Amino acid sequence: MPKIAILLLAAGQGARLGGYPKGLLMKDGVPLLSRFWLEASQLQPCEAITVLGFYADRLRPLALQYSKTITNDQPERGQSSSVRIGLAALQSNYEYLLIGLVDQPQITLRELQALMTHAEHVRGQVRAIVPCYQGQRGNPVVLTRIAVEAVLATPNQGCREWLDQNPDHVLFIDMPHESYIRDVDTMTDLEYENLSMSHS
């Protein structure tokens, strides 16, 4: 089993949901933040970090049940800023980093294991694994330690920029189902994924 670090991005504002923390959206009675970690923890990560931003105070108690937390004090700068903060916080001797998004309710252990299986098959040949479905890039993504160091070496660069600039180092994998590209941005997405807002 390779050493895997896992980074969960949960800093967004959820503006198109009326300003609601996506990590608290409920699926089958469980918050999305918890659902992710309950699945991802089965990979037995050597390090687990949740990046918070908007709604940090509401999400932190939940996140701390599964991971360390770090806060992006300027989440309005966008996802790439949260990624860099998370990358810089890594302290373990990991081989691979899996970066997940809190608003992907269809991501389960099956999808995560599929990514890691591909990563192991091409060990040493590429520096990143990106799932795709019908030509659309998805998440989570997997980076090697070398890729993480390369992202951090360029100020203000996020993972997306590095992936775009280094296609020869990236394996884009066509996946058989939509789980990797489904996320939650609008009320329509909420209905599609059968999610609800907690009133607690």
Report the location of each language-model feature.
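N-terminal glycine-rich phosphate-binding loop and ensuing alpha1 helix
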Residues: P2-G53
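Conserved alpha/beta core of the MobA/IspD/sugar-nucleotide pyrophosphorylase nucleotidyltransferase superfamily
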Residues: P2, I6, E149, T154-S200
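Hydrophobic residues at beta-strand termini and immediately following loops
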Residues: K27, I70-N72, P131, I173, ...
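Residue-level signal for inorganic ion chemistry
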Residues: L8, P21, L33, G86, ...
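Residues at secondary-structure transition points
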Residues: G19-K22, K27-P31, T50, F54, ...
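Conserved N-terminal catalytic core of the sugar/cofactor nucleotidyltransferase
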Residues: L33-Y96, R110
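Conserved beta-loop-beta/alpha segment of the NTase-like Rossmann-fold superfamily
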Residues: E76-R145, E149
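Hydrophobic packing residues within well-ordered alpha-helices of enzyme cores
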Residues: L17, L59-A63, L115, V151, ...
